[in-house]
Amino acid sequence: MKCAVDIESRDVEEMYINIDPIQAGGRLTVDAMKAAISFADGYSVCDNCRSPFRLDYIQKPPIAQFHADLAAWLNMDTARVVPGARRGFQAVASTYVEKGDPVIVTSLAHYTEFVAVEEAGGIPLEVPKDEKNHITPDAAAEKIEAVILEFSKTPPLLFIDHVDYQFGNVHDVAAITKVAHQYDIPVLVNGAYSVGIMPVDGKALGADFVVGSGHKSMAAPAPSGVLATTNEHAERVFRTTQAKGDVTGRTFGIKEVEMMGCTLMGVTVVGMMASFPHVKERVKHWDTEVAHSQAVVDALLSIEGTKVLSDYPRQHTLTRIDTRESFDKVAQQHKKRGFFLSSDLKKRGITGVIPGSTRVWKFNTFGLTEKQIRHVGESFVEIARENGLNIV
C-alpha cells in the first residue's frame, strides 16, 4: 500500500517485533500519533504565539509548561527542546569551544559529538576505553592531564556518554564528572540512550548539561531532543541575540542564538509532549526492561559459540553480540549466505537485525512484552537448531 505517489506505507511496527538497535525507544505512543495528525501542518504550534514570541513561552498548547516539566524531570534547572541530540551537542560546543581548543570525548563517543566539536573549531581527543569497554574515571584523569600538558590549556568541555551506542554499557558518569570538575571542566552527558529509557538524574550525575534524543528514546517524532542545564550555564548557552541591523536598526527580542530563535515548531514538539506522560511512567519499570534484555541474551548464549560483547549480566536493553562462531559459520555454507538470519527471523515476525549480519551485530529489546521477549529468544534458538548449531 502506498501512502503517496511512490512512497510505500511503513508497517514495520504493526507487522513485526522490531529489535532495531536505534528504533526501539522512538516508537510513537498512540497519543503521539494522534497529536502528530492534529499538528502535522508546518508552524502548527504558532497559532497562539504571543509576545515575547518564543517557543518556550507558548501557553497553548502548553509548551512553556512542558519545558519546565522536562527540566524538573531530569533534575536540572532549565531545558530547551532541540532538533535531535546532535543539536544539543552543537549548541554547547558552539558556546564553549574556540578555534584550536582541545575537547575531551571518548573512544565510545558518537560521531555527532566529534562533528559538533569540529564545527566549533575544536580538536576532539579521546579517552580510551578499558578492556571491559568502559570509560573509567582514572582514564579520564590521565587524558585530561595529557591534554593540558600538550596544549598548555584546560579543555573547555568534556563529553561522556551515559550509555554508549557501541556496546550499550552504562558508564560511571558521576565519577567521571567529579574528575572533570576538579579541573573546572564542564561536562556534557550524552543521554541519547538513557533519557526516556531509564531513570536519569542530571544533578546526581554531576552533569552540567544533559542531552536526550526524542526520536531515539522519548517516543517522539524526528528530529527531536532535549538540552537541559543548570543555572550556572543557562545564561551563557541560552544567551539571547544582540544583533542589530545596520540599515534598519532592527533587533530581535529574546530569540536565543544557539536555538536559532525557535526549534521545534510543530509535530515534533507536540509529539514529544503527548508521549511525555508515558515516558515518565515507563522509566519506572527499567528493571523489567533489563530483565527482558537478559532473557534474550541468555537465549543467544545458549547457542554454542555465541558471545556477548556488552556487559554481562546486562544493564541495558541495547546489546552487542558476537555470532562469528555460531550463525556466521552457518552463513558460510548457506545458500542465502549471511542473509539467512534476518530472513528466518522475518518469517517468525521479527525484524531489526541488519540483513546480512551474522558476525557482530546489535539489537534492542526495549518496549517488548513478556510474550514478545519469549518469542524472540525462542526464535533465535530455533533458527540455530534448524541450522545444525548446538544448544548448550
UniProtKB/Swiss-Prot annotation:
Pfam families (UniProt xref): Aminotran_5 (PF00266)
Classification via InterPro entries: Aminotrans_V_dom (IPR000192), PyrdxlP-dep_Trfase (IPR015424), PyrdxlP-dep_Trfase_major (IPR015421), PyrdxlP-dep_Trfase_small (IPR015422), Sep_Cys-tRNA_synth_arc (IPR013375)
Cofactor(s) in the UniProt record: pyridoxal 5'-phosphate
Modified residues (N6-(pyridoxal phosphate)lysine): 216
EC assignment: 2.5.1.73
Reactions that this protein is recorded to catalyse: O-phospho-L-seryl-tRNA(Cys) + hydrogen sulfide + H(+) = L-cysteinyl-tRNA(Cys) + phosphate
Positions that bind pyridoxal 5'-phosphate: 85-86, 190, 213-215
Record GO biological process: translation
Keyword set includes ATP-binding: no
Keyword entries, A-Z: Protein biosynthesis, Pyridoxal phosphate, Transferase
Subunit structure: Homodimer. Interacts with SepRS.
Family: Belongs to the SepCysS family.
Role according to the record: Converts O-phospho-L-seryl-tRNA(Cys) (Sep-tRNA(Cys)) to L-cysteinyl-tRNA(Cys) (Cys-tRNA(Cys)).
The protein, known as: O-phospho-L-seryl-tRNA:Cys-tRNA synthase
